[in-house]
A protein has these predicted regions:
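The feature captures the ABC ATPase H-loop/switch
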Residues: 108
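N-terminal beta1-alpha1 cap of cysteine-dependent amidohydrolase-like domains
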Residues: 1-104, 112-114, 120, 124-158, ...
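Catalytic cores of DNA base-excision repair glycosylases
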Residues: 159-165
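Short basic/aromatic active-site micro-motif
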Residues: 168
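Active-site-proximal beta-strand elements of phosphoester/diester hydrolases
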Residues: 204-207
């Protein structure tokens, strides 16, 4: 039986929630059945977790800095407290149940915050080292910069090489990494691009958008979703 995969949705202005189709297609093509999980269901996260085999924390708006003990930086973008509340509760539930999680962009940052870590509210203003471009102007399917992978990590095993190229659409990033996560990918300017849990069966976070590269035929991105679905199938 194909595993049922929850994917969190984003909030827009007005009474709408949405999800880019690339997430859905990537899960289907990897062998899973996608189910959208909207904001506003925080009180039912246990029931949701029990119904699902895996969770994708999708990209989107900035996470409220209050959740990691900071005041808002002048350069912080839009925050959506209702989404933050639900996803924090859902992530905790999945971590407690040791069910597979794939955190993408904002989703990786949120995983780190859930476990006690912090993020840069704005890379340009807060990162010490000179930065490469992290908000590319090229198409979403274009891999714009390099990421160096940690040997023997999930991504290193999938890629079978020390470096991959990824797309980039963010102005925030993981800052202080929380236990049980370890850094498994960095860009040339030192920005954390990937992390994985040393405690759980499969919890992986990536700062880029593999669902967009998946659609363009990128093999590493396809393998990310395939190994995620495989772990969701082995519950």
């Amino acid at each position: 039986m194909k595993p049922l995969i929850g994917i969190t949705t984003d909030l827009t202005e007005g009474p709408k929630q949405f999800l880019h189709d690339a997430y859905i297609r990537a899960i289907i093509q990897a062998g899973g059945v996608p189910l959208l999980v909207p904001a506003g269901v925080g009180q039912d996260v246990k029931r949701i977790e029990e119904s699902l085999d895996g969770l994708v924390l999708s990209g989107g708006d900035d996470v409220d800095p209050y959740l990691f003990g900071e005041e808002p930086h002048p350069q912080i973008g839009k925050v959506t407290p209702e989404r933050d509340e639900m996803e924090m509760a859902l992530a905790r539930q999945f971590l407690s149940a040791d069910k597979p999680i794939l955190g993408i962009c904002r989703g990786m940052q949120l995983l780190n915050i859930v476990c006690g870590g912090t993020v840069y509210q704005d890379l340009t203003a807060q990162h010490v080292e000179p930065l490469i471009q992290h908000k590319q102007q090229a198409a979403k399917s274009h891999a714009s910069h390099a990421v160096t992978l940690t040997k023997d990590s999930i991504l290193h095993r999938l890629a079978a090489r020390n470096e991959i190229r990824v797309n980039s659409f963010h102005h925030q990033a993981v800052r202080d990494v929380a236990s049980p996560f370890v850094v498994t990918g960095q860009s040339t300017d030192g920005v954390i691009e990937a992390m994985e849990s040393t405690k759980h069966r499969f919890v992986l976070g990536v700062q880029w958008h593999p669902e967009e590269l998946h659609a363009s035929g990128d093999l590493c991105s396809q393998k990310i979703f395939e190994v995620f679905i495989k772990n969701c199938s082995n519950l």
